[in-house]
Amino acid sequence: MCGIFSLLNYSTNKIEYTKVSDEFAKGQGRGPENSTLFHDNALNIVTGFHRLAINGLNEVSNQPISVVAGADRYSLICNGEIYNYKQLYKLMDVTPTTDSDCEIIIHLYIRYGIRQTLRMLDGVFAFVLFCPNNIFVARDPYGVRPLYYTKNDEDHNKVNGIIGFTSELKTLCKIANQFNQKVLQFTPGTFLTIDKTIDFERILWLIKEQERYHIPAFASSVNENVNENISSYLEGINYHLRAAVTKRYTTTERPIACLLSGGLDSSLIAAIVCDIHKKQNLAPIETYSIGLPDSEDIKFARMVARHIGSNHTEIIVSEQEMLDIIPEVIQAIESYDTTTVRASIGNYLIGKYIKAHSSAKVIFNGDGSDELAGGYLYMSSCPDSVEYDKETMRLLNDIHLFDVLRSDKSISSHGLEPRTPFLDRGFVNYYLSIPIELR
């Protein structure tokens, strides 16, 4: 897990580097292994990166990553994992200059442009790409990786301001307040182009017009013969989910663990991870569950762990411990939403435990399936399949505000990287292509 930070200053005032450095440091929990902050005095741009190394564990792979092509230099900061980077290098016959999977973004852009680059990436990401004439900002389709930006108050003088991008809301708040700005979520599945040659007022208009590159591929009509292909759909679900887990398992150089609540979602993911892991003849994968004494979740997680043969740890907490940790949780997830805070407490405490007692850095979870597959209890009350489909679309479009925010920040705040196979682009696209009646 990593954290990105960038400020483009269009103010008449110079950026005070020391103050910016203090704010940037607030996001270090996401990337405790290396932090860099660069200030380009000529362009009045600040670029920062907190790194948790998952691939390319050497200093050469630290960010920002720069690539020179002819007379032009391209630089990138990216919080993400690109699962198909090796296949893309082979396709383009390009040799990378680092071992970072994110470097592929630069090479794709140089050859294909930004739109095609975003279509070809299989992964989760939030990045800022600095090119000779433009700056591009983009976020993955479902907002698995967080990204915020500054927005001017409509009544404020538009000429005096900054544009800021960050993985952590807390790193931009004071800076934005100085310029009477708001800090908002960058819309998932979109990108922004900033032309370096145009004025700030025009740039502000462009920021409002983020361009969408991804729209969920929902089934478009009711299928009258839904029962004829049930077995093929089940095979397809199995294939695509296993593929989603496999690519996330193989794209890491750090130890892996799984969250295991005892529910169907996390149990499926943990079972697939264990199945892949056993074929490597390695020690059993670590799984973790948390709950109150005599919790039903703890009991079911124990049963699943025994069945899949994992090295299981149960973290038993009291109600008071859960209440006491709430201020820390709110600080970590950067949300006061009651449901999100409540749901984050367990993940936050597990992340804290793993950081202290395990070498695991990549943490699999079962998040995203309830939104995708209608797992919430109220979904059974949908009047018809069309309304069910509409509600699923709403949940997926908003998932970055709630469950994905929770699953990322409650884990990443401890210097760990969560991985969410149920929100794999290929798996989601396949699942949503299944007739509504079967979903």
Predicted regions and their residues:
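Short histidine
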Residues: 20, 68, 78-131, 259, ...
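Residue-level signal for inorganic ion chemistry
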Residues: 31, 80, 105, 192, ...
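Short, polar/flexible loop-turn hinges at active-site or ligand-entry regions and domain interfaces
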Residues: 91-97, 112-116, 173-183, 336-339, ...
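N-terminal glutamine amidotransferase
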Residues: 1-77, 81, 111-221, 225, ...
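ATP-dependent adenylate-handling active sites, centered on carboxylate activation for C-N bond formation
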Residues: 8-15, 111, 133-136, 144-147, ...
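A generic structural signal for nonpolar/aromatic side chains embedded in well-ordered alpha-helices
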Residues: 24-27, 92, 109, 118, ...
